[in-house]
Design a protein with these regions (language model features):
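Alpha/beta-hydrolase fold active-site loops
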Residues: 1, 43, 105, 112-113, ...
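N-terminal active-site segment of His-dependent metallophosphoesterases
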Residues: 1-61, 153
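Active-site neighborhood of phospho(di)ester-bond hydrolases with catalytic His/Asp-centered motifs
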Residues: 5-7, 44-50, 78-85, 159-162, ...
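Short, solvent-exposed loop/turn segments at secondary-structure junctions
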Residues: 13, 54-55, 89-90, 167-170, ...
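Active-site-proximal segments of metal-dependent phosphoesterases and phosphodiesterases across multiple
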Residues: 18, 61-62, 128-132, 152-196
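Glycine-rich phosphate-binding loop signature in dinucleotide/nucleotide-binding domains
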Residues: 37-41, 75, 150-156, 189
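Extended active-site neighborhood of metal-dependent phosphoesterases/phosphodiesterases
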Residues: 57, 62-148, 181-191, 205-231
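Short, catalytically relevant binding-site loops at active-site mouths
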Residues: 122-124, 165-168, 202-203
Length: 231
């Protein structure tokens, strides 16, 4: 099975943010990514979050998402889009998935492989991120028991997809508040083959006890930040 992956386009009307993010260029990069995914005959495409970014109005954010959705739809490749902190801060979860309802991720089993999608756009107190929030360093996955149950019931290999970071090698600001507990749970399961992450724009790859942690470089900061993985 071939997966096409990309992360952190931060698509918006802004030409440059934070001195290094070329937000307005990302729509063209997404188009090129899907051309590549079609050439590679990918079975599924996954965006690992921060598809968009804040604008002056919610209407403009929705317009940006509509433009991206059109590219995804025209590709005819099944696509899942995880929500990232910038997506949640720009629109909120309900609005984001209202705009991208056909691309909302769902746990999926294909050819005996289980793909699990984790949403960590929550504060440490369990409250979900809302439009207008901005503390991206306070991030928490509140469904650890659900993950534990899913891993315990899995019969084959498991692949996890999440925007924020669990990998201990990534700096602390980008890691979940409960990353250590999730890391232990993943290692103890013996089922997880890889954890795919975004959020940390530099990207990195680590491996612990046979589990690969693959953090994709940000599309908004790189001309070719889209990848194919065979699982």
């Amino acid at each position: 099975m071939k997966l096409g992956l990309f992360s952190d386009p931060h698509y918006s009307s802004a030409k440059l943010t934070c001195g290094v993010r070329y937000n307005s260029r990302s729509l063209d990069k997404i188009r090129r990514a899907y051309e590549f995914f079609k050439e590679q005959k990918c079975d599924l495409v996954i965006c690992l979050g921060d598809l968009t970014d804040k604008e002056k109005t919610p209407e403009r954010v929705r317009k940006n998402l509509d433009e991206i959705a059109s590219v995804m739809r025209d590709s005819d490749i099944p696509t899942f889009c995880l929500i990232g902190n910038h997506d949640a801060f720009a629109l909120g979860r309900d609005e984001f998935y209202s705009a991208l309802s056909e691309f909302a991720p769902r746990d999926t089993e294909i050819d005996g492989k289980l793909l699990l999608f984790l949403d960590a756009c929550y504060f440490n107190d369990g409250k979900p991120y809302q439009a207008g929030d901005n503390d991206w360093t306070d991030t928490f996955y509140p469904y650890a028991q659900h993950l534990s149950d899913a891993l315990g019931a899995a019969q084959g290999d498991v692949y996890l997809f999440i925007h924020q970071n669990i990998d201990p090698a990534v700096d602390g600001d980008h890691r979940l508040c409960n990353a250590d507990a999730l890391f232990e749970l993943i290692n103890a399961s013996g089922r997880v083959k890889a954890v795919f992450q975004g959020h940390f724009h530099a990207g990195r790859t680590s491996e612990y006890s046979g589990v690969r942690y693959i953090t994709l470089p940000a599309m908004c900061q790189n001309d070719k930040a889209y990848y194919v993985f065979e699982i």
